[in-house]
């Protein structure tokens, strides 16, 4: 496998799906990602939503919205191109998008339109008006079913509070049945209980998909508002840091050691990095036996936090942190307070 990975890593092919050869076999590579859009709002009020901060009366206007779309489409189109130039990701989960109209405007931007990127979205109940969505390239990922599973408050005192649900998309990639659960768990303005509740409910959705089809390759991705080391991820969702630790009912979290050992993250706060943006996967995406690696179906290869200089603040007090759209009431013409994440999959071409 080392030779295969070296060939893939050094190859310069820009085919629809990158193909590499090793030992007389051919392999295809796919990228998937997640990116919190940090308040991708249009300039119009949505009835019943608290979107007033992003209206012209508060200084959010057509010029700023157009710049935001241009910036985000650039970053989204670049995700995955480290390995797959001119191809990018088969699908990308999104958080903090306002509505379907915003997604139409986003996918109409030249970098995404050139790849015919489409989107899945169902309007949710969040009072701020922010939803999850999934961008996808129909040449690489075929969508078969989309549903929004509601976040159910576990405490009676919270029954009136509505927040973001779990966007669940089933489809096919590389001939494999694939499901994606896109999440944006409750913020840290609330206690850890609510993120642990989100993890419990996410696990129920994941387990139901596997009961229906044990061969389904399931990804849970999103802004968890918790790190890989937190209880919600490590204990409740059972997302383990090492492939050798992953058992039945568990998931694999390749981001744990990136934070815990390398100190890298996606969100910079109070002088340190958090890694709230994660993509975890079911065991059937792993090669657990190092001596008998099987690539007849999609398997995990590698992952990274996606960093480009244009995504990073280059000067001032917050030098080195993600370049935001605005901060402290000042428009920065940036991207997001989060960095994107990307992981790569390989499958033998039969």
For the regions a language model picked out, list residue spans one by one.
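Bacterial Sec-dependent N-terminal signal peptides
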Residues: 1-19
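N-terminal, active-site-proximal structural segment of metallo-dependent hydrolase catalytic domains
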Residues: 14-110, 114, 120-132, 200, ...
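Metal-dependent phosphoester-hydrolase catalytic domains
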Residues: 15-24, 207-218, 226-350
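Beta-strand-turn-beta hairpins that frame and shape the catalytic cleft
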Residues: 24-32, 41, 140-142, 161-184, ...
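Active-site-proximal beta-strand/loop segments in catalytic clefts of secreted hydrolases
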Residues: 35-38, 95-98, 121-125, 137-138, ...
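Extracytoplasmic/secreted cell-surface and envelope-processing proteins
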Residues: 42, 101-104, 128-131, 189-192, ...
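Structured beta-strand-rich core segments of catalytic domains in phosphoester-bond hydrolases
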Residues: 97-177
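A long, amphipathic alpha-helix that forms part
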Residues: 192-214
């Amino acid at each position: 496998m080392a030779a295969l990975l070296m060939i893939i890593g050094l190859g310069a092919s820009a085919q629809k799906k990158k193909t590499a050869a090793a030992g007389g076999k051919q392999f295809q590579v796919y990228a998937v990602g997640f990116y919190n859009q940090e308040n991708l709002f249009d300039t119009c009020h949505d009835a019943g939503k608290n979107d007033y901060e992003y209206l012209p009366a508060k200084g959010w206007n057509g010029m700023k919205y157009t710049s935001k779309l241009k910036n985000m489409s650039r970053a989204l189109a670049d995700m995955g191109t480290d390995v797959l130039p001119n191809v990018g990701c088969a699908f990308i989960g999104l958080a903090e998008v306002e509505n379907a109209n915003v997604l139409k405007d986003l996918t109409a931007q030249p970098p995404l339109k050139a790849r015919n990127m489409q989107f899945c979205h169902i309007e949710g109940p969040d009072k701020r008006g922010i939803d999850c969505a999934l961008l996808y390239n129909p040449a690489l990922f075929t969508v078969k079913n989309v549903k929004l599973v509601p976040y159910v408050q576990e405490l009676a005192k919270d029954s009136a509070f509505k927040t973001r649900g779990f966007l669940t998309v089933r489809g096919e990639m590389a001939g494999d049945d694939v499901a994606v659960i896109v999440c944006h768990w409750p913020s840290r303005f609330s206690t850890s209980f609510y993120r642990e509740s989100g993890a419990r409910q996410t696990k129920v959705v994941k387990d139901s998909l596997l009961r229906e089809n044990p061969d389904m390759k399931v990804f849970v991705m999103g802004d968890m508002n918790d790190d890989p080391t937190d209880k919600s991820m490590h204990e409740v969702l059972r997302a383990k840091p090492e492939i050798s630790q992953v058992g039945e009912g568990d998931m694999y979290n390749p981001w744990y050691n990136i934070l815990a050992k390398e100190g890298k993250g996606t969100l910079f706060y109070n002088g340190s990095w958090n890694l709230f943006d994660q993509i975890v996967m079911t065991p059937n995406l792993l090669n657990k036996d190092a001596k008998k690696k099987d690539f007849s179906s999609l398997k995990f290869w590698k992952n990274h936090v996606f960093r480009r200089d244009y995504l990073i603040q280059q000067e001032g007090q917050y030098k080195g942190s993600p370049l935001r759209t605005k901060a402290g009431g000042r428009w920065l013409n940036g991207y997001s307070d989060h960095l994107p994440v990307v992981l790569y999959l390989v499958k033998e071409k039969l």
